[in-house]
Amino acid sequence: MRQPASEGLAAEMRRLAEASSDASRALSRAQPRAKDEALRAAADAIGRRAKEILAASAEDVAAARAAGQSAAYLDRLALDPKRLDGIAAALREVAALPDPVGEVTATWRRPNGLSVKKVRIPLGVVLMVYEARPNVTVDAAALCVKSGNAAILRPGSDALRSSLALAAAFAEGLAAAGLPAASAQVVPTSDREATFELLQLDDLIDLAIPRGGPSLIRAVAERSRVPVVKHYQGVCHLFLDQSAPLQQAIDLALNGKVQRPAVCNALECLLVHREAAGRLLPAVGRALVDAGVELRSCPTSTTILARAGVPAVTAAPDDYGKEFSDLILAVRVVHDLDGALDHIARYGSLHTEAILTRDLASARRFEREVTASAVMVNASTRFNDGGELGLGAEIGISTTKLHAFGPMGLAELTTQKFVVEGDGQVRS
């Protein structure tokens, strides 16, 4: 049980959330051109403030290095001129996207003459809790403001200096467009209790989105009174069905595992139909090993790979269901499609699941029976991404079925209200 925060910290977090709540009301009334102007002006401000942002980033990286963080962690944390240019470009891309607020998604007329329509509206105040990725500070702020929401941004403590510097540039953009400074606020302390105080403020904050590792997401979900949409780990599978073509099997396995092994839509487990294992596994396994992948395989697949001279280690029980985020891949031979479906139901994380098959019935059954935010048929798991699916920028990939499932773009940062128009009708 956590100790209560100091009265000063609790009061400070309430004031911050109250300012966000006030800003959200102003944003809900803001015209699209004002929001777009704010994002473009923020992009320009990042360019002007590049020197101080990079200096803040260097301080973050130096402190994290002194604390013994890994090279991969430091790479995610660091900003450089090229990455800053990418952050600014992303702001301009969001500004160019259609504004979802006010969109009429359905309309109909009742027999009594009432006209009914559903209209997109902002959620209100969104609390974003994430790890040491300073680019998320700007990405989340941009998507929230564009969709009419105020953002409270809680980065990992290692990214606090750079996030505050980026937020200062973003605030310039808000000011240029006449929008409230509290439309996007970074929590200005590394005290973890600040997060837990904010998570109690369900009277002011409408949604919490944790984005990071299992411990972060579990802590937020367990301690929040605010509704939570989890962006959880991606334990993504590719099932090679009996009819899977060999070259496509190699291509999908390599793309899913090797291109960016640490991202949430990377492949973590390869399932192979037993009737196709002897035909597919030697070549697929060789291609993966040649690309630097360590294979952790079941006894059947280990035997097949060994006969082909492909090195593999015997998988431990907990290798299935694990997000390796590295050049490591679990491999298992399953009896048939039923075996693949059972394995995915047991070990999947509701993120992304894929099948490679030439059998239409198998494809349709896989689509129908697999529960995941995205189901891929004859395509890489890496396509579960807002940009790749044509949705534009995303705040993350939700593995929560409510309120959004899959990539969360602008539309997923809204809800809908009913608007009913009549001419004096009363209910009988």
UniProtKB/Swiss-Prot annotation:
GO molecular-function terms, A-Z: glutamate-5-semialdehyde dehydrogenase activity; NADP binding
Subcellular localization: Cytoplasm
Principal subcellular localization: cytoplasm
A GO-annotated cellular component: cytoplasm
PANTHER family reported for this sequence: DELTA-1-PYRROLINE-5-CARBOXYLATE SYNTHASE (PTHR11063:SF8), GLUTAMATE SEMIALDEHYDE DEHYDROGENASE (PTHR11063)
Family: Belongs to the gamma-glutamyl phosphate reductase family.
Name of the protein in question: Gamma-glutamyl phosphate reductase
Organism listed in the record: Anaeromyxobacter sp. (strain Fw109-5)
Lineage: Bacteria, Pseudomonadati, Myxococcota, Myxococcia, Myxococcales
